[in-house]
A protein has these predicted regions:
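Conserved beta-strand edge residues that scaffold enzyme active sites
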Residues: 14-15, 80-82
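Low-complexity, flexible helical/coil segments
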Residues: 13-20, 42-49, 64-65, 111-117
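Helix-to-beta-strand junctions that scaffold the AdoMet/dcAdoMet cofactor pocket
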Residues: 1-3
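Conserved class I S-adenosyl-L-methionine
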Residues: 6-41
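Short alpha-helix
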Residues: 41-43, 52-79
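Core SAM-dependent methyltransferase catalytic element
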Residues: 69-73, 90-119
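Class I S-adenosyl-L-methionine
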Residues: 41-51, 82-106
Length: 119
């Protein structure tokens, strides 16, 4: 980014993965990825395709430290108690608001948004 340029990041809150009963993860980053193999893709068609994905989890402090390291200054940080996208194990609480089914009565952070500017 050029000085004064803006970065907008909207991501799943790392806390949400702690409640995944099928594949619990650690909150803090590890050198080894979580590996997941699934059939099909998120698009229509391609059901006969098998995809292996690697994921690394990053705590909020990891994300904020990485931004600071490259000269970004956070100007906004917000957390949301729902996801705009349904993941496995979620139910629709209101139109376009998905929450973990087993924790629907709790207000947990599902996503967060950060706006930062290049200093």
């Amino acid at each position: 980014l050029s000085p004064g340029g803006a970065l907008i990041l909207v991501e799943f809150h790392p806390l949400i993965w702690l409640f995944d009963q099928q594949a619990p993860v650690d909150y803090f980053h590890s050198a080894e990825p979580d590996v997941e193999t699934q059939k099909g893709t998120y698009t229509d068609g391609g059901e006969d395709v098998e995809i292996t994905s690697c994921y690394w989890d990053h705590s909020l402090s990891d994300v904020l430290a990485a931004m600071r390291k490259v000269g970004l200054e956070v100007t906004l940080f917000e957390e949301y108690d729902h996801s705009p996208y349904p993941l496995a194990g979620m139910v629709e609480r209101a139109p376009g608001e998905f929450v973990l089914a087993e924790r629907a009565q709790q207000r947990l952070p599902h996503c967060y948004a950060i706006r930062a500017r290049k200093v």
